[in-house]
């Protein structure tokens, strides 16, 4: 069974299928702030999506991160490691030219349900 949650005009923020929760690309609400603050906001939003799906950040198994400025990666990494602690997921970080709307970072995660 597939369950789609939190519909937007172009996607569902979270999709549950076969014991996994897939969280689509998430950007910060305020894109005028630093990479670290955008990361903190995104991870807070993702935590909420995971909770709504009946899981949490300790169950995140993979992440794809897109950033517009790899020179700011250390700032993102500091917030990332603080958020996940000892439960760091597998991860890829990719530099991109533009994310639109002033976003510096976009995050996609996959978690285990439950």
Regions found by a protein language model. Give the residues of each.
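Short, polar/acidic, helix-capping and beta-turn segments at strand->helix junctions
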Residues: 1-114
């Amino acid at each position: 069974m597939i369950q789609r949650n939190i519909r937007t005009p172009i996607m569902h923020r979270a999709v549950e299928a076969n014991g996994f929760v897939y969280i689509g690309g998430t950007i910060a609400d305020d894109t005028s702030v630093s990479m670290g603050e955008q990361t903190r906001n995104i991870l807070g939003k993702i935590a909420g999506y995971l909770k709504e799906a009946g899981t949490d950040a300790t169950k995140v198994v993979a992440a794809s991160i897109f950033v517009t400025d790899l020179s700011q990666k250390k700032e993102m990494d500091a917030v990332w490691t603080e958020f996940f602690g000892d439960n760091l997921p597998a991860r890829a970080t990719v530099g991109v030219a533009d994310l639109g709307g002033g976003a510096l970072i976009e995050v996609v995660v996959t978690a285990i349900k439950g």
